[in-house]
Amino acid sequence: MKCYATLVCVAAALPLFAAVETKTEKDVVYAPPERCRLDVKWPKGTTNFPTVVWFHGGGLVRGGKHFVRIDESIAQVAVNYRLLGTDGLTDGAECVRDAAAAVAWTLENIAKYGGDPKKVYVSGMSAGGYLTMMVGMAPQYLKERGHDIGELAGLAPVSGQATKHFNVRKFAGDTDPQFLPKIDALAPLAYCSKDIPPIISICGEEPWEWKCRSEENRLLISSCVALGHDKAWFVSCPFADHGRAFTAGVPYVEMFVQGRIPAALKVK
């Protein structure tokens, strides 16, 4: 009988950083809209390193690009994307298209910085976690950019909405209650499959976490496993609310990228 694995966040998971010298390039244009800019940070003096593409949170209506505190031997691409309600944008699919464009840019350009394009991971917090899942699970967005979700090394959404994002619904004119789950073409849950990249979904713990957030991510992971996926994990960070899921969860992004998810917890 298949089941999904749940990891417990503990102090031992906190990262230990070696001294690594890095370089940074800011405000790189990855698509024509003015907000479509990204920052790149990469380790000097080494090659073939992995890269995390990081999408910020903010409900798809606010926030800005930033790096996260992980081992600096891992490159980071921090992304700005267009926001709903800004410059008349009301279609949530356009936010996903921006995210896909940034991932495509990374696949096409990270080798110029010394990175391995076969080691590109996608991650993000909250709205950024939603974008992570949409880009990495819904194949049409990367296909529009000439790429395939199979090119990604892994997905690590942190407290992302697995149903249709509440602000995507709001700006589309949906007036139903926020916590009434909707699953359609703009919901990651619609794309559960054994064929998506390796995925680790990281959330806070109910009842502290955002309502329904942990439960719907558990459903996403368990559905992928039931469909035959053998590299899918769910992480529950004890006592963490939505904000603390970020600080408690980022170390697991690092563990995932470095292949340090304990073998005993791999999905069977």
For the regions a protein language model found, what residue spans apply to each?
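Alpha/beta-hydrolase active-site loop
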Residues: T90-A111
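C-terminal catalytic histidine-bearing segment of alpha/beta-hydrolase fold enzymes
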Residues: I202, R218-I221, V225-K268
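N-terminal cap/lid segment of alpha/beta-hydrolase-fold proteins
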Residues: A19-T46
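The feature captures the conserved acid-bearing segment of alpha/beta-hydrolase catalytic domains
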Residues: G146-V168, F179-S222
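Primarily recognizes the serine-hydrolase "nucleophile elbow" in alpha/beta-hydrolase
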Residues: A104-R169, I183
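Short beta-strand element of the alpha/beta-hydrolase
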Residues: N48-G58
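Short amphipathic alpha-helix adjacent to the substrate-entry channel of hydrolases
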Residues: G64-N80
